[in-house]
């Protein structure tokens, strides 16, 4: 299944569910180190952890890494800031390739380390949002691929262990929970025709808090969890409030802190 196409086009969850795998599921794949997965890829989305790891490795800021490798735009459905890796050059190659080799192999983005697996959060969509987010499950799919071979049988669990990816990835679950909650508020504001200037300030604040405000000389997770612990209560409050109260709260908040976000 092409999970990236599904996510871009907002596919039917029932279709996705047919392809979901758990930790004991098996798939056939053996990497031939051909490098195809590093070229002609326009589907790589960076998380804050990915950006931090690259910035830490090269002694750069988060903003520098984003400017050198990516574009940032509002997600079509989520309306959230999306950091999308942009291929470069005549070979349409990953900007992190140097002389044909991955320059961040030891800290590559999780989506690259997982390949050909994809990872999604899954929950019962018949439940209220808060109950959905309290009962998140991590599931996996095999992406459509045109490289490698089918000579090796792998379990999902073995594949994760081989590339040092935690089965119970605290960041992945917490990040998705925060992202989904904030997306709900962002969409509510857009649908209510929130004053454009206020929406822009809120969007930029989310982008800076979620993606930029990290000290790469310090560990990532304590900083991320501190940010999430501060932001999440406000997002919960905004998501539960009537829209006019949401707008009023944001106007008051930015009047106190200034609008130069």
Question: Where in this protein do the model-derived segments appear?
Answer:
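Short loop/turn segments that flank or connect secondary-structure elements
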Residues: 1-261
């Amino acid at each position: 299944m092409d999970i990236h196409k599904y996510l871009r086009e907002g596919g039917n969850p029932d279709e996705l569910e047919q392809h979901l795998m758990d930790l004991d599921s098996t798939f056939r794949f053996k990497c031939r180190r051909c490098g195809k997965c590093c070229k002609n890829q326009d589907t790589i989305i960076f998380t804050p952890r990915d950006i931090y790891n690259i910035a830490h490795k090269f002694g750069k800021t988060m903003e520098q890494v984003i400017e050198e490798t990516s574009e940032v735009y509002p997600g079509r459905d989520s309306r959230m800031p999306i950091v999308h890796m942009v291929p470069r050059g005549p070979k349409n190659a990953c900007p992190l390739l140097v002389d044909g080799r991955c320059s961040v192999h030891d800290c590559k983005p999780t989506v690259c380390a997982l390949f050909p697996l994809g990872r999604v959060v899954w929950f019962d969509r018949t439940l209220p949002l808060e109950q959905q987010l309290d009962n998140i499950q991590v599931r996996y799919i095999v992406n459509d691929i045109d490289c490698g071979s089918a000579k090796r049988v792998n379990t999902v669990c073995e594949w994760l262990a081989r590339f040092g990816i935690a089965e119970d990835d605290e960041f992945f679950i917490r990040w998705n929970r925060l992202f989904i909650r904030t997306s709900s508020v962002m969409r509510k504001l857009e649908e209510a025709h929130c004053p454009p200037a206020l929406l822009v300030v809120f969007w930029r604040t989310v982008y800076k808090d979620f993606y930029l405000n990290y000290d790469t000389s310090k560990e990532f997770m304590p900083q991320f969890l501190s940010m999430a612990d501060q932001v999440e209560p406000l997002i919960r409050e905004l998501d539960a409030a009537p829209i006019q109260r949401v707008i009023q709260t944001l106007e008051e908040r930015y009047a106190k802190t200034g609008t130069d976000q």
